[in-house]
Amino acid sequence: DAKKTLELQNEVINDVAPFAEKHGLLDQCMAWSLAHAHIMETTAMQLATSFSCLLQQLIRNVMEYNMDHQEVPMTGDHFHSFVVNSLVEAALYSFGGSLMSSDLHEFCRMIRSLTTIPLPSSEEPLTNFYVDVNDGQWHSLQTCVPKVNVDMRTILDTSVVIPTVDTLRNQRVMEAFLNSRLPVILCGPPGSGKTMTLSNCLKTMPHFDVVSVNFSSSTQPSLILKIFEQYGCYQKTPNGLVLRPASPDKTLIVFCDEVNLPEEDKYGTQRVISFLRQIVEQGGFWNPRDHLWVQTQNIQFVGACNPPTDPGRV
């Protein structure tokens, strides 16, 4: 219930607070990250939001564990170990997730030098490990990679995902961001597996529906409105007009591929991107047909794009 959730959040805060002090682990991770190049331009607010999302996932993991182990919930050393180790993991992916590969490895070494928390072997980067909710300790992701037999008839099928350390790592982080209900951007060169990462992750998350749309240089807000008409449901409520997914028990993910392709207008605005920002920041949009404000509920956006340094990208 709400009381237990609040108590759990306060317990987590008590364990996290020492690392959030000035010149503490989180402060130094933030400063280090902002001083290095990312695959896309980033800000302190974006990094802090990412960390908050992963911290929320930490709390969800504890709540789910306690629901499954009501007779022996997570307490004492188990709870403390899980929180502080998950804190390091959250800092690793929130502040370092969009760094270049070489900088990410250096970031892992920097984290090791800053904390007295027992961390796994320094022979491998921290990104090859995860924190297990069952004991609160670090374990190798390699131990979680299942052995699969691939049918030769499906070897050329691009929808087939062979589990690896990389796919498992991406899935864990992606699930946390999707559960936060905040927009997500996947950025990487062509063929790096952006679409595959999302598709593979959603296989284990049945409470999401996804619709994909490919952006081009001429994409306009009208395309998003058509998506809403087809996959959403407008409902009149005492608080005004509300747009929800057609399936009331699910969240609709609008996957916008090549999201940085639309051209700027003469005022320097990418109109479809501004429209998406309005929905995300204001929680709705102005319907041009009915001249009414529409509040959106359970609709989430995920974008994929090539690095902005590529030709034709904005």
Predicted features along the sequence, with ranges:
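Short helix/loop capping segments that flank catalytic or ligand/cofactor-binding pockets
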Residues: 195, 223, 263-265, 311-313
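Short glycine/proline-enriched turns and hinge-like loops at secondary-structure junctions
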Residues: 185, 267-269, 314
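Short regulatory helix/loop adjacent to the ATP-binding pocket of P-loop NTPases
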Residues: 201-205, 308-314
